[in-house]
Amino acid sequence: MAVVTMRELLDAGVHFGHQTRRWNPKMRRFIFTDRNGIYIIDLQQTLTYIDEAYEFVKETVAHGGTILYVGTKKQAQESVKNEAERVGMPYVNHRWLGGMLTNFQTVSKRLHRMKELQAMDAAENGYEGRTKKEVLMLTRERTKLERVLGGIADMTKTPSAMWVVDTNKEHIAVSEAHKLNIPVVAILDTNCDPDVVNFPVPGNDDAIRSIDVLTKVISHAVIEGKKAREERALAAAKEAAGDANKTEVAAKVEATEEVAAEAEAK
């Protein structure tokens, strides 16, 4: 069964690219035609590339990997947040801080500070002894940190791969990923550079419905990857238990043989 159908892509407007005057010539091979000054993306190719991206994400998660969802443009914010939270993956949907990956140690300190402020706010007497002005400043600091770092609060190390909506807008994130050899899976609109993406998904990165349907595909791959991981872990546990039982039986047989040998000697 297909991960997503041609009809679903058409209904979501995934095939609509940018105006013909706003394009990247490197995207030529992904373009089917142009209509009324708008490039039309070849959805047959999109389906093929979706399958490749899907398998990569699924296998990455199946082997214990983490996928970081990135989409800070207005049209992507809600979908990125909702889908990442639905599958338990980290996300950035408001602002990409320079060094979020390449200087993760510093970012980790900011995460620690955010959690300190959250604990203070949750405690019954967390603000005891502080003035109203101090409480207001601490609240503002916490809110600001949560807005920018809330989606990666539980991320303890750099991700295994990254899902990106609009590689042009998220060029800093993509650049940092490349420096750390983190594979990038991304929607490629007709004004994007395919050379900066490891697993391209040719499609409309401006329409909310298009972003939503493609991000859901990635989330489905994450879910399948988690299932595969659990199945492998269960199989490994059963195998380990089986080996333990075999060892125990062998030990009992050996002990019985020794007793029999001693009895015969007497």
Swiss-Prot record:
GO terms for molecular function: structural constituent of ribosome. One of its GO terms (biological process) is translation. One of its GO terms (cellular component) is cytosolic small ribosomal subunit. Signal peptide: none annotated. The keyword GTP-binding does not apply. The keyword Ribonucleoprotein applies. CDD domains: RPS2. Keywords: Ribonucleoprotein, Ribosomal protein. Pfam families: Ribosomal_S2. HAMAP family: Ribosomal_uS2_B. NCBIfam families: rpsB_bact (TIGR01011). Belongs to the universal ribosomal protein uS2 family. This is Small ribosomal subunit protein uS2. It comes from Corynebacterium diphtheriae (strain ATCC 700971 / NCTC 13129 / Biotype gravis). The lineage of its organism: Bacteria, Bacillati, Actinomycetota, Actinomycetes, Mycobacteriales. The gene is rpsB.
